[in-house]
């Protein structure tokens, strides 16, 4: 599919800010001020009601290995963006949705998964940020979970992350074989009990690659429990990052939406 993530009048969200028209800027200001007055639940409900006007760009079918090669060709043709070298600091805004929270809550585990899993890994060859560099993400990172969709995520956050945030030593077997989680998975709308582990593993590469991960605007206690550093503003985050990358770092911003694959040279 293409990258038309937002219909009118929200298409400005998929544009680079310097491309905004006067109308776009007006819509942004009006939307921001309105959203700031609403409770989180209402804001989520409004965002999830937006239907993307996606269109199909290609269809592949047949033998898996052959289809995979052809699919990659089309993905690279559509999404590949050439980037000149790695950066010291990578900034990115984490959206309100991920593959695992449609009509649901973007909980702290999914913030980690979306940032250090999906967005960090959207590259070919090597990551946008150098090894030992700093990743700065912006997201409110509320300690909020959907009890029907993500019951094991709640326990993962309270129980597992209180013990460790190193996926190599986590207690996956207990969650995978828990009968109550299995029951909810089979009879309700819950993800499997082991799902938060896989979400965490998906972000583990980015977590291990970066020298420091900072979340701007996140609830401080929640951010620290994830193993990251909280910051109130982007300026604060850059000051914190200077301890890792020095006072004159290179900075790259991954603008989402749209979706891209960085081809780092």
List where the protein language model places each region:
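Glycine-rich beta-alpha junction loops
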Residues: 3-5, 94-96, 141-143, 257-258
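A short, acidic, amphipathic alpha-helical segment used as a generic capping/interface helix at domain edges
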Residues: 66-82, 117-125, 189-207, 232-244
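Flexible loop/turn segments at secondary-structure boundaries
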Residues: 97-101, 143-148, 221-224, 259-262
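C-terminal catalytic subdomain
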Residues: 104, 109-213
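Conserved, well-structured core segments that form the ligand-binding/active-site neighborhood
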Residues: 1-86, 117-121, 127
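Structural motif
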Residues: 88-93, 136, 252-253
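Extended hydrophobic packing segments that form well-structured cores
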Residues: 9-14, 201-265
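Glycine-rich phosphate/diphosphate-binding loops and the adjacent beta-loop-alpha structural elements
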Residues: 45-61, 89-114
């Amino acid at each position: 599919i293409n990258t038309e993530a937002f219909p009118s009048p929200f298409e400005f969200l998929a544009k680079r800010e310097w491309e905004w028209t006067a109308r776009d800027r007006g819509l942004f200001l009006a939307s921001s001020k309105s959203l700031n007055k609403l409770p989180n639940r209402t804001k989520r409900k409004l965002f999830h009601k937006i239907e993307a006007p996606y269109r199909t760009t290609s269809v592949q079918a047949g033998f898996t290995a052959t289809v995979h090669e052809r699919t990659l060709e089309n993905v690279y043709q559509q999404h590949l963006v050439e980037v000149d070298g790695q950066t010291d600091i990578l900034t990115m805004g984490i959206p309100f949705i991920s593959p695992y929270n449609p009509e649901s809550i973007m909980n702290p585990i999914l913030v980690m998964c979306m940032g250090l899993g999906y967005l960090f890994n959207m590259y070919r060859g090597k990551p946008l940020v150098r090894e030992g560099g700093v990743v700065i993400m912006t997201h409110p990172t509320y300690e909020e979970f959907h009890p029907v969709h993500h019951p094991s995520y709640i326990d993962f956050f309270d129980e597992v992350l209180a013990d460790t945030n190193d996926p190599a030593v986590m207690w996956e077997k207990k969650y995978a074989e828990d009968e109550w989680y299995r029951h909810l998975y089979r009879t309700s709308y819950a993800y499997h009990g082991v799902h938060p582990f896989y979400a965490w593993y998906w972000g583990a590469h980015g977590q291990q690659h970066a020298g420091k991960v900072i979340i701007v605007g996140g609830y401080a206690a929640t951010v620290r429990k994830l193993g990251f550093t909280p910051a109130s503003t982007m300026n604060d985050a850059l000051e914190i990052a200077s301890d890792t990358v020095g006072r004159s770092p290179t900075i790259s911003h991954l603008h989402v939406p749209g979706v891209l694959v960085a081809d780092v040279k």
